[in-house]
C-alpha cells in the first residue's frame, strides 16, 4: 500500500547517503581575518553583533567587518546575502537566536556557511536550545556546535547588550578557532 514512511525529523533522505558533514576548517587565531555578521530581525540582534564585531577588531585583530541583516527570522538568509558573506568574509558570527524560529534558522544559516567552508559561530539564547538542536538534526548535523548565551536578549538595555557581547566573545572566538570543538571532543 505504501512505499515508505517519511519522518521529517530525520532530515532529507539524501543525508544518509552523503555521510556526516564536516565543519569548515578553523584558523588558529582571528588576526587579519574578515568578519561577517549575519543578524536577524530580532530586537537587539544587530546591536549585539555590532558589539561583538568591535570587540573582535579591538581584541583579536579582525581587519574588516561586513554586516548583513536577514529580512525575516524564520527563514535562512537569502542567497544574495549568503553570496556577500561567502565572497567577503573568512569567518561569520550568526545571531541572535532568541526565539524558537530564529534559533532554528540561525543554526541553519551556520550550517549553510560551514558547507561553504566558512567557519561560523552561531549565537542562541539558552531558552531555545531545543529548537536549535532540532534544526541541526533536520539539517543532518546532530550536535552542531553553537554558543548558548543566557536568555533573554530582546529586552536588554544598550548596556546589557554590551555586557552580553563582552561575555560571549571568548566563546565565539573558541568556536571560530576550533578550541570549543576540541574541548568538546
What are these regions (language model features)?
Residues 1-24:
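N-terminal amphipathic/basic leader segments beginning at the initiator methionine
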Residues 28, 33, 37-54, 63:
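Glycine-rich phosphate/diphosphate-binding loop of Rossmann-like nucleotide-binding domains
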Residues 58-71, 143-150:
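Short beta-strand elements in bilobed, periplasmic/extracellular small-molecule ligand-binding domains
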Residues 72-83, 161-162:
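Structural motif
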Residues 79-90, 109:
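Short, well-structured alpha-helical segments in soluble
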Residues 107, 111, 115, 130-141:
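Active-site-proximal loop->helix
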Residues 149-184:
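A charged, well-structured terminal subsegment
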Amino acid at each position: 500500500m505504501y512505499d515508505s514512511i517519511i519522518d521529517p525529523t530525520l532530515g532529507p533522505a539524501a543525508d544518509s547517503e552523503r555521510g556526516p558533514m564536516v565543519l569548515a576548517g578553523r584558523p588558529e587565531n582571528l588576526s587579519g581575518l574578515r568578519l561577517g555578521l549575519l543578524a536577524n530581525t530580532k530586537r537587539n540582534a544587530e546591536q549585539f553583533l555590532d558589539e561583538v564585531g568591535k570587540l573582535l577588531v579591538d581584541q583579536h585583530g579582525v581587519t574588516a567587518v561586513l554586516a548583513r541583516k536577514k529580512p525575516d527570522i524564520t527563514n535562512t538568509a537569502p542567497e544574495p546575502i549568503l553570496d556577500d558573506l561567502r565572497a567577503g568574509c573568512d569567518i561569520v558570527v550568526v545571531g541572535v537566536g532568541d526565539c524558537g524560529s530564529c534559533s532554528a534558522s540561525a543554526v541553519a544559516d551556520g550550517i549553510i556557511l560551514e558547507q561553504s567552508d566558512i567557519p561560523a559561530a552561531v549565537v542562541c539564547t539558552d531558552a531555545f536550545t531545543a529548537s536549535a538542536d532540532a534544526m541541526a538534526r533536520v539539517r543532518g548535523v546532530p550536535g552542531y556546535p553553537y554558543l548558548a548565551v543566557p536568555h533573554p536578549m530582546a529586552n536588554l538595555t544598550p548596556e546589557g547588550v554590551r555586557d552580553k557581547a563582552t561575555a560571549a566573545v571568548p566563546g565565539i572566538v573558541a568556536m571560530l578557532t576550533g578550541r570549543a570543538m576540541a574541548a568538546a571532543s
